[in-house]
Amino acid sequence: MGVFSNLRGPKIGLTHEELPVVANGSTSSSSSPSSFKRKVSTFLPICVALVVIIEIGFLCRLDNASLVDTLTHFFTKSSSDLKVGSGIEKCQEWLERVDSVTYSRDFTKDPIFISGSNKDFKSCSVDCVMGFTSDKKPDAAFGLSHQPGTLSIIRSMESAQYYQENNLAQARRKGYDIVMTTSLSSDVPVGYFSWAEYDIMAPVQPKTEKALAAAFISNCAARNFRLQALEALMKTNVKIDSYGGCHRNRDGSVEKVEALKHYKFSLAFENTNEEDYVTEKFFQSLVAGSVPVVVGAPNIEEFAPSPDSFLHIKQMDDVKAVAKKMKYLADNPDAYNQTLRWKHEGPSDSFKALIDMAAVHSSCRLCIFVATRIREQEEKSPEFKRRPCKCTRGSETVYHLYVRERGRFDMESIFLKDGNLTLEALESAVLAKFMSLRYEPIWKKERPASLRGDGKLRVHGIYPIGLTQRQALYNFKFEGNSSLSTHIQRNPCPKFEVVFV
């Protein structure tokens, strides 16, 4: 393009041998070598000036950042790579081409290797090998690894109040690079929930038991007040059938979920009150259609299918009020049925977004986390290809963004114009892209049939890659269009994840 490429073409000092030759071997009679040189000397500056003017006119249409990128790419790319200014390609097509990257590591040929655990998933969107022995250096390993370049992983589903190393800050101090716990703030959460494990939408059964609630509590030395809460409820004349080792009054040799189906309430009492520590006690109650009465996670509402689907004893002072509520619901069928309405109408989008996370096995999510980290490190290196990430034509600038569904590895391109860097435009661009691909969400085959929808994609959230699931699902939100615009302009080729519901 323009001035530099044209200056590389003609040579300034032409020799006698380079002049046109007539058939008889003499030079053209119309001009001598000296007159030709004079003509070249006369017209060459004019030609150069014209080309410079044209070039400046083109470059002035770019903003400053685009000017730097254009000049950088000019010196590293052939003229065929810079046709966007000539109108041969649209900005989107040009960006798709010049922003493309061939990374130094092809995971299809050189898969992620995780050491210290057997592979426990069928498929994953990034090639990944797990095992105990290999000639290859691991990308990550369970336990504290002292091998340089290998990430150390801790994985546990136990409460941090019983196992201090599961505390996120403690794990970091010990040297773990990747934390996998029940905490949604961990790098790769490993929760007790999933569509595959629990038939959450199972129909409600008749409540035939005389007792209001059932309890299955065997650890009578829990580090919270659950045993005291059980005793206090019994003293309020709430009849409870206890199948566990604590205050047992019923034969414990029953199938738990089947037994719970016939009680109006289930005591989902955890052994600790810890954020995000929500175990099978709660989810089995949902399966059974027995309203869970919770002692446990202070943020239990984030794990509930609807706001009125549970009762929460946050502290001992709440016992009397909860007991009163249980009796009221038991005596008022319409009010009680409201607590189970989600079974018929479907749970909230936030609940579906949470459970959908488990549609991708935690080990696969670990592999994606490691692969993403490897790519990010390469992109930060000085040797990494510089990409324009935006294109300006006239007064309009087009920005190149990348997006993937949560649980996938590969990215898809979307584009936004500078006059429309809005949250609405971002969502529309994401939907348009994935709908054009006839994309099927990860959870499609995992959810119960009644929750798979009508085939139309709906966005629950879009967030920058790198956030924890706590941030992505509950805490993060762009503060209006200006916040999104600033993020896009400050982060060339920004990457996002989308959660579909």
From Swiss-Prot:
Keywords: Cell wall biogenesis/degradation, Glycoprotein, Glycosyltransferase, Golgi apparatus, Magnesium, Manganese, Membrane, Metal-binding, Signal-anchor, Transferase, Transmembrane, Transmembrane helix. The keyword Ribosomal protein does not apply. Glycans are attached at N64, N337, N420, N481. Its cofactor is Mg(2+); Mn(2+). One of its GO terms (cellular component) is Golgi apparatus. It comes from the Eukaryota. It catalyses: N(4)-{beta-D-GlcNAc-(1->2)-alpha-D-Man-(1->3)-[beta-D-GlcNAc-(1->2)-alpha-D-Man-(1->6)]-beta-D-Man-(1->4)-beta-D-GlcNAc-(1->4)-beta-D-GlcNAc}-L-asparaginyl-[protein] + GDP-beta-L-fucose = N(4)-{beta-D-GlcNAc-(1->2)-alpha-D-Man-(1->3)-[beta-D-GlcNAc-(1->2)-alpha-D-Man-(1->6)]-beta-D-Man-(1->4)-beta-D-GlcNAc-(1->4)-[alpha-L-Fuc(1->3)]-beta-D-GlcNAc}-L-asparaginyl-[protein] + GDP + H(+). Residues 1-39 are cytoplasmic. GO terms for molecular function: alpha-(1->3)-fucosyltransferase activity; fucosyltransferase activity; glycoprotein 3-alpha-L-fucosyltransferase activity; metal ion binding. It comes from Arabidopsis thaliana. Its EC number is 2.4.1.214. The gene is FUT11. Residues 61-501 are lumenal. PANTHER family: ALPHA- 1,3 -FUCOSYLTRANSFERASE, GLYCOPROTEIN 3-ALPHA-L-FUCOSYLTRANSFERASE A. Glycosylation may be important for enzymatic activity. InterPro entries: Glyco_tran_10_C (IPR055270), Glyco_trans_10 (IPR001503), GT10-like_C_sf (IPR038577). This is Glycoprotein 3-alpha-L-fucosyltransferase A. Changing S218A: Loss of catalytic activity. Its main location: Golgi. It is an enzyme of class 2 (transferase).
